[in-house]
Amino acid sequence: MKKLITLSAFAAALVCLFSCETYKVKDPEMTAINKVDGKYMAFAYKDGAAEPTTMFAIVITNTTNDDADAGWITITDIDYTGLHWQRLFAVRFKMTVDANAQTFVASNSSVIEPKTAWNPYIEGAYGSYGSFTTASAQWGNFGCTTASINGKVVTEGVTTPSGHKADSIEFTYTLNYDDGTSESYTVKGQKKTGWGEDAIEYEEWLAEKGW
């Protein structure tokens, strides 16, 4: 009987040993440019205007090879005047990134049009993630050639209305068209936090515009 009790205790100890074993949880995988990548909302001031001309939804992503010195930026103009709220104008181009300084730059980088554009104000609606077919992809009138950009992301650079810290983004940006014209903007904004109140300034501005 004593032998059976001893064997039972040994078996219980083995069960505890294996069932109580802890496993190290891997840290989330980060991109090589994780200090600058992500989704941002920003006001755009055209040609040095004192008041915002429009609002941009910005997405910065890493390259296919996850290069530490390069990335892609997609800039979507939320102004759908003359277009459609599901058909926004967007451009995408490659830029050089300094991951440590959290800066990015491009000079006359070739522009492509993404097939879809991120609109933060319809994100999650209509079974979507805020992405809809871009205007030119729908109607075939893109007309852009190159873009130049010079900017920086500051970690926790702004305090949001919810009281949280968010990364800030600021850059100058010029878009060139195939007819020889161009548009230049100064852009200032913040990373999307997921808190509704943090976007209230942008929402109110859009509502005032009737967009």
Language-model segments: residues:
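C-terminal motif of bacterial Sec signal peptides marking the signal peptidase cleavage site
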Residues: 15-19
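First exposed extracellular module after export/assembly in secreted or surface-exposed proteins
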Residues: 29-211
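Bacterial signal peptide processing site
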Residues: 21-24
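Positively charged n-region of N-terminal signal peptides that target proteins for export
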Residues: 1-7
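Repetitive helical segments and hydrophobic/amphipathic motifs
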Residues: 11-12
